[in-house]
Amino acid sequence: MLIAKVIGTVVATRKNSNLIGSKFMIVETLPVMGETQRLVAVDQAGAGIEDLVLVALGSAARMQSGSENSSTDAAIVGIIDNPEEIFIK
């Protein structure tokens, strides 16, 4: 799992049937997680722009969609309530 910040949205009117009704967000991993990267993640938690979120990748992201056959590779699975209380040593 990664900690990332929501920096944008993606609008896709045509998509795989497993993803109909899903909201897509652009997230950027935090520098403390290593090299920063931007990903498109399916929002399972109702995140908004500027939120710090937990992002599941791979099979963990697919499990969140409710279908192992989903084409999901990244999913927002949580919103961090108190970002200032994250401790990284």
Residue ranges of each PLM-predicted region?
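OB-fold and OB-like single-stranded nucleic-acid-recognition modules
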Residues: 1-3, 43-44, 81-82
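N-terminal first-folded block
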Residues: 1-32
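Conserved RNA-binding domains used in RNP assembly and mRNA/RNA metabolism
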Residues: 30, 35, 55-57
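Short alpha-helix capping/helix-loop boundary micro-motifs
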Residues: 37-41
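C-terminal structural segments of small proteins and small subunits
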Residues: 54-56, 60-89
